[in-house]
């Protein structure tokens, strides 16, 4: 290795259960992180902040199409070595809205005012598995049209939309 006197060596401890995972950003950049299966999503966001300077509250991590929750661990999501997570930035101006189903269940969504109704239906599909073409969204008594934005309908943070299912074959 041609190590000469007074050289400095660096000792890197590889923790038991330590592994590398990759985080891909929307710009296509890939970040490599050293993690353990027992790390929480919070921990992972903190490591991304250390490397990239992005505050954790602006980070959304996606794996296998699911948004990862802060308190859960990598092991909970079966994220193994060399898995790739996707990092989506939650822009300032992001907000939560609620979607209430006819069964009385309430779904919380992270959205932006500029999101279209299409986008919102796609988020509902991610969370609930309901295809967008079966979803009808109602706010303040009005049915919401796909191409319009939340801002168009003056839907603000913590607004509640109502989800009605359009059954196949129904008009």
Swiss-Prot record:
Major localization class: cytoplasm
Cross-linked sites for Glycyl lysine isopeptide (Lys-Gly) (interchain with G-Cter in ubiquitin): 66
Function: Ubiquitin exists either covalently attached to another protein, or free (unanchored). When covalently bound, it is conjugated to target proteins via an isopeptide bond either as a monomer (monoubiquitin), a polymer linked via different Lys residues of the ubiquitin (polyubiquitin chains) or a linear polymer linked via the initiator Met of the ubiquitin (linear polyubiquitin chains).
Highest taxon in the source lineage: Eukaryota
PROSITE patterns reported in the protein's UniProt record: UBIQUITIN_1, UBIQUITIN_2
Stated name of the protein: Polyubiquitin
General remark: Ubiquitin is generally synthesized as a polyubiquitin precursor with tandem head to tail repeats. Often, there is one to three additional amino acids after the last repeat, removed in the mature protein. Alternatively, ubiquitin extension protein is synthesized as a single copy of ubiquitin fused to a ribosomal protein (either L40 or S27A) or to an ubiquitin-related protein (either RUB1 or RUB2). Following translation, extension protein is cleaved from ubiquitin. For the sake of clarity sequence features are annotated only for the first chain, and are not repeated for each of the following chains.
Keywords: Cytoplasm, Isopeptide bond, Nucleus, Repeat, Ubl conjugation
Propeptide positions: 171
KW S-adenosyl-L-methionine (keyword) present: no
Cross-linked sites for Glycyl lysine isopeptide (Gly-Lys) (interchain with K-? in acceptor proteins): 94
Domain Ubiquitin-like positions: 1-18, 19-94, 95-170
Native source organism of the sequence: Hordeum vulgare (Barley)
A Pfam match: ubiquitin
One CC-aspect GO term: nucleus
Matching InterPro entries: Ubiquitin-like_dom (IPR000626), Ubiquitin-like_domsf (IPR029071), Ubiquitin_CS (IPR019954), Ubiquitin_dom (IPR019956), Ubiquitin_ubiquitin-like (IPR050158)
GO terms assigned for molecular function: mRNA binding
